[in-house]
Amino acid sequence: MPASENRPSLAVALATTADSVAAWLDGAIACSGAPGARLSAAMRHATLAGGKRLRPFLVIESAALFGVPSHAAMPAAAALECIHCYSLVHDDLPAMDNDDMRRGRPTVHRAYDEATAILAGDGLLTLAFEILADDATDADPAVRLALVASLARAAGVAGMIGGQMLDLAAEGRFAEGAAHGVPLDLPADSIIELQAMKTGALLRHACEAGALLGRASPPERASLDRYARAVGRAFQIADDLLDVEGEAGLVGKAVGKDAAAGKATLVGKLGIEGARAELARLVSEAEAALADFGSAATLLVEAAYFIADRRN
């Protein structure tokens, strides 16, 4: 889709957001004296290694729909990125996905050690809520409270963490006897629910955070939520397709691991062509959800197409 004449292209907007978030986190994660220096270094390794910064971008662009400048949305955006990065640190651990590479370089537990990686993830998790509680995030304590509650729900048992637990259960991790390690044959509806929790919840929070900062009306918040739900599902399908078709050097992490682990994915259930058709439908659904915002939502609409077409 063409960018609005008065707004930057999506590539420029994503790059600007990525640079701004990195600079903000660089200042927020201070290097302290030993033993804090090792912990801070591990937290910085997790957060300053690049990445698309898609979640902060969604916070900033959702807030922009209501006239909130990017610098005012940055604390909420950075807090969400802390949660995302913490989840990656813990997901990469041997007890979870056992990955050696992330964003083209060693994962935190490989660069440091498992104990430091666990604590670095914990540090990022708690830093996120420290950021949201600060009055620099928003002058209105009610808005800060709403942001904290929204992120806690999205990252917690009803969201990301619960989705990860369902994912592990689907791999047969908790079964006993001969069933241990045997993947479950989940129906498509169960896979969608799992992915909505594991991946979609944080993306929904991103748009909700922007709406909260912008004092959006209930109908406006509902429109953004419909967009985020569709984008969340599209993101996971695209991610699963990358695991099947991607190249490790481009993706920045190992590929082919989902099938090897017997992970439940819509690509496995629908096949590649069926998954691509569902991906196209979800992008159209995301675009339709933002129709009432007109050209102000151009970058958010472009982001949906970008998510579907990404190569890393």
Predicted regions and their residues:
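N-terminal amphipathic/basic leader segments beginning at the initiator methionine
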Residues: M1-A30
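Mg2+-dependent prenyl diphosphate-binding active-site environment of isoprenoid biosynthetic enzymes
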Residues: S20, I29, G33-A288, S295-A308
